[in-house]
Amino acid sequence: MFRIVTDTSANLPTAYLQQEHITIIPFTFHADGDEQACLDLNTFDANTFYAQMRSGTKVSTSQIPPQRYLDVLNPMLEAGEDVLFVSMSSGISGSYASGQIAARQLREEFPARKLLLVDTYSASLGEGLLVMRAVDCRREGMSIDDTYTLLRSLRHRMAQIFTVDDLRYLRRTGRLSN
């Protein structure tokens, strides 16, 4: 048995996360300098977020810092649990790299424990589907190593397509460069 941890980008319902004992590490965003955590789909008000962007409020997102990973993962490893972290794509966020920094430190502190990070190459439901597959693997009794290997294989079999109404919002939040 192993713990599954992901970030809020997975967009999974809170009831599912609780039922399957999945821990979430939240992303944060800033609206006019005010930091707000995106904890889950129940507490994050997407309508307000997008209305703020449309009204000209300066909104920016930020990656999960290494310390937040340490705060969440350390107690799990300390309790003798192995952890599989399923992350948003490293291509659109630095959070996976932050997770790697924290993981290096934690592996030194807990050499007997396994801490494996999966870069999903996805976001939103693509990431969420891999989290759900990890839950299925755990339920079926697969090892953390076999689950990790499977997820790394499956991430190459997905493609995500999205559209936006206006590119300026991607530019404002740092998701689109000049």
Pin down the residues of each PLM region.
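Class I S-adenosyl-L-methionine
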Residues: 36-109
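Mixed-charge interfacial surface used for oligomerization/domain docking
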Residues: 3, 9-17, 22-36, 91, ...
